[in-house]
Design a protein with these regions (language model features):
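Expand to "…catalyze enediolate/carbanion chemistry for C-C bond making/breaking, isomerization
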Residues: 1-284
């Protein structure tokens, strides 16, 4: 991989969370999203976790290989009794993708890797410790992607909300969002953007997803099926963007250095932008 290439990430762009204790939602979540995250952590009350593990593993035992390749299991934080229970029950199923909640260090990733050596780990950095160790976490060989989470992050530092009343992120959340993206890129891994909690605010979700695309996030997580299409639309170039990118790349074939195109000066970074837009257009 060229060091300037974005990390490959086969699961995006819309990753949909689904409570692991709601088997009635599993099929619909998988059908409507690019990948489904079966959540054993925050979406399941402590008293319900044992049942959730049971119904989730029943589901995992019956899905085909294609569905399995698009299924992520979010497990509880390393070093907890719930983590131990999660990995014990999952040992017989060997999920392809595991999301580790509240990842604090590369050793947390290693704790997953020891038990699931073939799994790709999506490390969820959603605490002050995880954010501070983002580069170390991203650098672990088993880490396929890192994701950030806003609300648990703010809780971990004593705050009360991740956003201002107008819906924009507070500076600390914006800082961590950028830090996660930079750590992922520096280590050649994919970055996944946090969820947008206001299900009714489609315009806000669309704007945030568009910013995720423009900034370099490989995917964005979501919590409701209605959020999938706005995320997909944000990652899909418009007809005008695709036409410009293809025309620019065609023109570049006739030049060996910087050149003018449609009133602008074009150099290598702008060609890389065009290549990525063309790739997203092809992925459709």
């Amino acid at each position: 991989m060229n060091r300037n290439d974005p990390a490959a990430f086969a699961l995006g762009p819309a990753l949909l969370f689904c409570p692991a204790g709601r088997p009635d939602r599993f099929a619909k979540a998988a059908e409507r999203s690019d990948a489904v995250i079966l959540d054993l952590e925050d979406a399941v009350a402590p008293a319900d976790k044992e049942r959730a593990r049971r119904v989730m593993t029943d589901h995992l035992s019956g899905i085909d290989s294609h569905t399995a390749s698009r299924t992520v299991v979010r497990i509880n934080p390393a070093g907890t009794a719930e983590f131990d229970a999660d990995v014990q029950v999952l040992a017989g199923y060997q999920p392809e993708h595991i999301m580790l909640a509240k990842t604090q260090s590369a050793e947390d990733v290693q704790a997953v890797h020891r038990r699931f050596p073939d799994a790709q780990v999506i490390a969820l950095c959603e605490t002050a410790g995880g954010a501070a160790a983002a580069h170390e976490i991203a650098g672990h060989p088993a880490t396929s992607a890192i994701m950030w989470g806003a609300e648990d992050l703010v809780v971990s530092i004593g705050g009360t909300s991740s956003r201002h009343p107008d819906g924009t992120y507070r500076d600390i959340a914006r800082h961590v969002r950028s830090a996660i993206l930079l750590a992922a890129a520096a280590c050649g891994k994919a970055a996944v953007d946090a969820i947008y909690a206001d299900i009714s605010d489609t315009a806000g979700l669309s704007a945030e997803a568009a910013d995720a695309v423009g900034s370099g996030f490989a995917a964005k997580a979501c919590i409701h099926p209605s959020q999938v299409d706005p995320i997909r639309q944000a990652y899909r170039p418009t007809a005008e963007e695709a036409e410009y990118a293809h025309a620019l790349l065609d023109e570049a074939a006739h030049h060996s250095g910087a050149f003018q195109f449609r009133g602008g000066m074009i150099d290598t970074p702008l060609l890389r932008h065009a290549e990525r837009i063309a790739q997203r257009a092809l992925a459709g």
